[in-house]
Amino acid sequence: MAIFRDYSINPTEHDRTIGDRRRHRELVEKAIKDNLADIVSEESIIGESKSKKIKIPIRGLKEYKFLYGNNSSSVGSGTGNEKKGDIIGKEQMGNGSKGKGKGAGNSEGEDIYETEVTIEEVFSYLLEDLNLPNLDKKKYSEIVTDSSKKKAGYQKYGIRPRLAKKRTVIEKIKREQSRKRAIKELGKDDKVERLPFSEEDLRYHRIKEKPKKECNAAIMCVMDCSGSMDSTKKYLARSFFFILSKFIRMKYVNVEIAFISHSTVGREVTETEFFHKVESGGTYISSGLNTAMDIIKERFNPATWNIYGFYVSDGDNFTEDDERAIKSMRKFCEIANMIGYAEILPYSYSGTMKYKFDNYVKDKNFISSTIRNKEDLWPVLKKMLIKELKE
């Protein structure tokens, strides 16, 4: 006799692709992290929409199978230090090479596939565990970080997961009692049969989405656009702010971001100008910091707003402005939840502003880091976006 298994109870039991899809997602996540420096520092994606697609290489997965050796004296055993996905016995079975960028090789390579992901998907893999540090509850909260769903009454139509079982039973009992009263009023003594559930008994929870408000936050993005910031430095600075702005907009709703560029004079610019306009001239770091504080004074009262400052420069400041810059940074720290200062390619550490800020700005909400190449972008940003600053 044939036996048919009912998969309607748990339709995922026979879906053999679930594990494959999970493994594929893990491979995509690993590939994004391994190629992060190249992805986020690719200048062509700066300022692009979140739906723009980029390609990343993913190492292929092979089915398990037995492989015949080449009759060598060695065996294809591991050394004990292998990791998941490594090919065992590869080095022992020959001295061939794959030929990766340095001449032709004679060994079989790995299967590498390219998959397309959107910019939004890239950052969704990476930004889940990051938060604005020291985010305080302020008056007149406006930031919506999530939408909480709350039950708000009942309705006659809905989806099965929202079926209100208790309310449905009550409606059925009410219908039964109404029928009994009607029969009694008619003077009939007929035995009342048990009524089954009907569509008119069904009641579903009405769900109302309620915005979950937390705190106000204003982000000051300040970038040094002086003549000493060559194309490489500006490219790294823009990449840093591109990742930062994507994080802010994906993690928080209605957050305010101000973009400030400066040489000897600081001014607020549009986001497009910030990422694409080229400037020159000397460097007064204090001008950028003072412009940020002027904007805060005009639009963002620290009593009701969480203030964050992110400043990127090569640290090459005009000497007469050093003292003013240190003074401005101290003032900024007094009103801000956190200030992150990233210095790009310091050619002489003892003469740059990072060295001076580290020595004269002792506030706990001040974080300084160095960006020497594109591989440093992600670690520096992670350092600044810890949830709570250490005491």
Curated annotation (Swiss-Prot):
Spell out the InterPro entries in the cross-references: Spore_YhbH, UPF0229, vWFA_dom_sf
Q: Which domain of life is it from?
A: Bacteria
Residue ranges, compositional bias (Gly residues): 96-106
Question: By its UniProt entry, which SUPFAM superfamilies does this protein fall under?
Answer: vWA-like
Q: Where is this region: Disordered?
A: 1-20, 75-109
Question: Record's family?
Answer: Belongs to the UPF0229 family.
Name used for this protein in its record = UPF0229 protein CA_C0580
Organism per entry: Clostridium acetobutylicum (strain ATCC 824 / DSM 792 / JCM 1419 / IAM 19013 / LMG 5710 / NBRC 13948 / NRRL B-527 / VKM B-1787 / 2291 / W)
